[in-house]
């Protein structure tokens, strides 16, 4: 019982934030386009996901020509593939 209490208290004190994967949206509600160049697109997305969004990394999903990010904070708004790629948020 004490162990459970310590674990719960630790999470509260650390304010653990959830993570998710997805196509992030910018401040205008648009996804990050990465184009058709595989090398440039993957480098751009990986850097943007790590630096701007504090994720683990990312790459260009060439099916949608949009950046996909791994392990980004839950607070980042992401695109659902049935929505328009630019949407007011």
From Swiss-Prot:
Please report the stretch or stretches of sequence annotated as the LCN-type CS-alpha/beta domain. 20-87
**Signal peptide start and end residues:** 1-18
Describe, from its UniProt entry, the tissues in which this protein is expressed.
Expressed by the venom gland.
Q: Where in the cell is it found?
A: Secreted
Keyword terms, alphabetized:
Disulfide bond, Ion channel impairing toxin, Neurotoxin, Secreted, Signal, Toxin, Voltage-gated sodium channel impairing toxin
Cite the InterPro entries for this sequence. Answer: LCN-type_CS_alpha_beta_dom, Scorpion_toxin-like_sf, Scorpion_toxinL/defensin
Disulfide bonds, which pairs? 30-86, 34-60, 45-67, 49-69
Q: Which Gene3D superfamilies match?
A: Knottin, scorpion toxin-like
**PROSITE patterns tied to this protein:** LCN_CSAB (PS51863)
Q: Name one Pfam family in it.
A: Toxin_3
Q: Which GO terms describe its molecular function?
A: sodium channel inhibitor activity; toxin activity
**Could you confirm whether the keyword Secreted appears in this record?**
yes
One GO cellular component this record assigns the protein to is:
extracellular region
Instruction: State the similarity comment.
Output: Belongs to the long (4 C-C) scorpion toxin superfamily. Sodium channel inhibitor family.
Q: What does this protein do?
A: Inhibits voltage-gated sodium channels (Nav).
Notes concerning its domains:
Has the structural arrangement of an alpha-helix connected to antiparallel beta-sheets by disulfide bonds (CS-alpha/beta).
Q: What's the protein called, per UniProt?
A: Sodium channel toxin To13
Its organism's taxonomic lineage begins at: Eukaryota, Metazoa, Ecdysozoa, Arthropoda, Chelicerata
